């Protein structure tokens, strides 16, 4: 990664994170990651969930609708698991910031990775629900009642896959995550913006008005520009604020 590209990405992502060096991993050449280890786990974990779903659908179940139905039929359990990992995420952050205990970048990365990977499953559920409502995919998503054992096998395999990624990324290819991280961050915000525009499209899809049907695309473009403006603005404003607060209050 070229120095100019790195500096540009480090700047635009500075609005997302404090970027404190001791709370961040380092990549090849000693380059600090664009966000802290906890946020690194969050963004990569979100992307990882969609990769795991794709790989399992392609090579194990060989039917994308099988996993889609498992997710749709067991969303309450998935939300419970997400809240469990979110509590670990929050407890680790709160107790370390309040100096009740010391934590490590490995723990920060772990809590972010597992929390966000299950957040990805919830996002997948919302995408499936919207697509089903928009395109009436009742044949593909039939909400068939799968046995709990099928879902348990899937969720265990999913968590095992996340764990394997966690261990291998730490001990084998951690420095190379620096290259994956920008993709994961952009993917995260792309999914959020797309979900918002899909919801808008769902609201106007029944209206026979060509101009209104263009509204979701206009909103998508506007949100992208708004996000970039937000990132650049925070990048300029943040330099002398977050670090000062950290040095005076937390350190």
Where are these regions (language model features)?
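Secretory/periplasmic and organellar redox-cofactor proteins
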Residues: 2-32, 37-251
């Amino acid at each position: 990664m070229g120095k100019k590209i790195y500096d540009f990405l480090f700047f635009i992502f500075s609005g997302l994170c404090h970027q404190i060096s001791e709370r961040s991993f380092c990549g090849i050449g000693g380059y600090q990651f664009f966000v802290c280890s906890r946020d690194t786990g969050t963004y990569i974990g979100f992307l990882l969930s969609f990769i795991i779903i794709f790989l399992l659908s392609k090579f194990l179940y060989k039917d994308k609708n099988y996993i889609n139905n498992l997710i749709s039929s067991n969303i309450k359990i998935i939300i419970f698991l997400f809240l469990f990992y979110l509590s670990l995420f929050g407890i680790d952050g709160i107790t370390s910031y309040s100096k009740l205990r010391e934590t490590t970048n490995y723990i920060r990365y772990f809590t972010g990775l597992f929390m966000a990977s299950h957040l990805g499953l919830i996002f997948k559920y919302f995408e499936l629900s919207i697509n089903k409502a928009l395109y009436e995919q009742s044949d593909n998503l039939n909400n068939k009642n799968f046995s709990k054992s099928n879902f348990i096998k899937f969720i265990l395999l999913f968590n095992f896959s996340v764990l394997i990624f966690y261990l291998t990324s730490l001990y084998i290819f951690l420095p190379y995550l620096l290259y994956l991280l920008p993709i994961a961050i952009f993917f995260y915000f792309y999914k959020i913006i797309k979900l918002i525009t899909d919801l808008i499209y769902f609201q106007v899809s029944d209206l026979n008005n060509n101009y209104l049907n263009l509204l979701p695309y206009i909103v998508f473009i506007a949100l992208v520009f708004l996000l970039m403006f937000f990132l650049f603005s925070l990048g300029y404003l943040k330099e002398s604020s977050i670090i000062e607060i950290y040095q005076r209050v937390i350190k």
